[in-house]
């Protein structure tokens, strides 16, 4: 299975990489959060731009991205607009969403973008191609904050992301029972062992699903999300605790 290298970080080998999310509403908030994150032990910084108030003003978005890059210079920067329908803070039209991601790619400030699987196959394929032309990697994602689909459906979605050109397919689902967590882990193993030719990221959310955030190296998930201050999704734990557990499992 091939790995994905972003800056000097190799995703898909060794312990799962830790992603943290920056969620400031204004440029001032973004700068102060980035400064607070500078000393934290993480691997990838995700900017959740759907939390940013001026998201429809390209100049403001790029100014904020530039400010983040000036403060955190050495970590890969993942640009993510999480749509309202997948648990995000705002809604954009498909045209606005694609234009925003293309502007991020054009800026030269970001290393990765997040593209939601269900944006539309043609739009997704074209944007993946555009990102790759500019040496920007693509995490393709799907989120279900209500339930855990059947393992077969989870695998099917991850395989479709791979077919659409994602560098890293990602899915996050909500467990209603402990068995739902096992469904997610089973799907992860099946995808990783039978179909994946690149790293994948999977997680079962909430307190019930925490084990999935910790045991990625065992089951086949290449990255996990942790919290520096405020969690960006249910079930995230602090980056310090996360690093400790990931290291223990890696060295076992």
Swiss-Prot record:
Alphabetical list of PANTHER family matching this protein: 3-DEHYDROQUINATE DEHYDRATASE
Q: Which residues bind 3-dehydroquinate?
A: 21, 46-48, 82, 213, 232, 236
- Record's HAMAP family? AroD (MF_00214)
Source organism, top-level taxon:
Bacteria
Family assignment from sequence similarity = Belongs to the type-I 3-dehydroquinase family.
Q: What is this protein called?
A: 3-dehydroquinate dehydratase
Listed pathway(s): Metabolic intermediate biosynthesis; chorismate biosynthesis; chorismate from D-erythrose 4-phosphate and phosphoenolpyruvate: step 3/7
- The protein's role, per its UniProt record: Involved in the third step of the chorismate pathway, which leads to the biosynthesis of aromatic amino acids. Catalyzes the cis-dehydration of 3-dehydroquinate (DHQ) and introduces the first double bond of the aromatic ring to yield 3-dehydroshikimate.
User: Cross-referenced Pfam families, in alphabetical order?
Assistant: DHquinase_I
Q: How does it assemble?
A: Homodimer.
Instruction: Supply the source organism for this entry.
Output: Salmonella paratyphi B (strain ATCC BAA-1250 / SPB7)
Q: Where is the active site?
A: 143 (proton donor/acceptor), 170 (schiff-base intermediate with substrate)
Family annotation (NCBIfam families): aroD
Q: Does the keyword Acetylation apply?
A: no
- List the Gene3D superfamilies: Aldolase class I
What EC class is this?
lyase
Name a GO molecular-function annotation. Answer: 3-dehydroquinate dehydratase activity
| Record's keyword terms, sorted | Amino-acid biosynthesis, Aromatic amino acid biosynthesis, Lyase, Schiff base
| Keyword Lyase assigned | yes
EC number(s) recorded for this UniProt protein: 4.2.1.10
Catalytic activity field: 3-dehydroquinate = 3-dehydroshikimate + H2O
Q: Which processes are annotated in GO (biological process)? A: 3,4-dihydroxybenzoate biosynthetic process; amino acid biosynthetic process; aromatic amino acid family biosynthetic process; chorismate biosynthetic process
